[in-house]
Amino acid sequence: MSITIRELCNDTYHFVSKEIKIIIFISVLAAFISILINVLIKPNIHIISIIENKKFLSSHSIFDLINSMSIYEKKELLKYSIFKIFEFLISKTFLLGSIITLITHLSNHKKESIQFSLNSLCKFLPSLFILNFITTFFIQIGFMFFIFPGIFLSVLLALSPIILSFKKNNLIDCIRLSISISCKHLNIVGTSVLFWMCVKFILTTVFSNTYIISKNFIFLILNINMNIFFSILIVYLFRFYMLFLRS
């Protein structure tokens, strides 16, 4: 049984159009979680001003900029970086887990109660968080050296959360299987991940150059939009993996 991009796009479109209200609700909820974390843990204003003024970009090297900082500024930058990583991981884990649980709940022939699905989500989130931490770590290392290794790793590891949701493999096996399947179906997985990255880049560029509305509101709208598109990517990849298991 051959799997085509067109077939996957049609299946994804039908699912998303049918469940768009729930997807938007989950996306908004994930965006509010990011905002709540930002409100609860306020980073140093001076460090934020350095980043927002794009001094990182104007500097010849990030390492040169870090070396020119005082010990206090270095500590604050480290704290800010850790805070942003955990904010990203928490919101991503919640979004991923919620969308995967939604798909599993709707595609399960045995009708399960909402309470059962919520319990499954709560049990799934800790292992998903650890997996996201591992995959994000390797992807960021890839982006640190060159852009292409980071993009390539993003494609290879894209299926690992979906494989984990089937509860048949441990974390390492999920990563190994994701790499193996993605390499064999690079056109299907790679196209979707690259499309998501392009959408993310366009949205970030457009909203970061918008000065009419307040920054907090822009941050909220940007997060909601990115979460919706990321949810669509998850639906696409989940459908692909289901068809892959049947083939």
Curated annotation (Swiss-Prot):
Chief place of localization: membrane
Source species, domain of life: Bacteria
One GO cellular component term: plasma membrane
Keywords: Cell membrane, Membrane, Transmembrane, Transmembrane helix
Membrane-related topology note: Multi-pass membrane protein
Alphabetized InterPro entries for the sequence: UPF0259 (IPR009627)
Transmembrane portions of the chain: 20-40, 82-102, 114-134, 137-157, 188-208, 217-237
Family membership: Belongs to the UPF0259 family.
Protein name, UniProt field: UPF0259 membrane protein BUsg_265
UniProt source species: Buchnera aphidicola subsp. Schizaphis graminum (strain Sg)
